[in-house]
Amino acid sequence: MCIRDSFGNVLGSNGSVIPLFKEQLENGGPLTVTHPDITRYFMTIPEAAQLVVQAGGLAKGGEIFVLNMGEPVKILSLAEKLIKLSGFEPYVDIDIQFTGLRPGEKLYEELVLQSEKDDIHKTQNDKIYVTSPGDIDDEKLISHIEKIRSMKPGDSREFLMELVPTYTPDREA
């Protein structure tokens, strides 16, 4: 059985922005933000674990499960609040620098595709929503998986870029 859990950013996990900001604060700044308007959804580690467990229990196969994480958070506001909570004044004591969006990065997170939004509805748990993916050609999918398995490690990136036009790798593998 195959399901997909659609996550926001998991607070406190590796790669989460909070530990990065804390490290940058400890070093005297600046805090780096990719774009002044960028927003992201957040969930805690226990929420992420519950989403996986409950989605597994609710799944029939092929669904997409999404946790209601409330409103997206503006990363710039998060940086400014963290600076203030640390006893500093943003842009006076600790600067914030904008680094620019990375390849493939979006200003606004999309937890489900537009085509998946039409069918989204609550589950028995009010914080978990479920939807169905768009039509998938199973034979074509299996063919693509077999092709990827037979490729040399460096060749799969080009193939993925053909399959997913919005996929933009940020560095060479």
Annotate each PLM feature.
Residues 4-173:
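Strand-loop microenvironment adjacent to phosphate/nucleotide-handling motifs in alpha/beta enzyme folds
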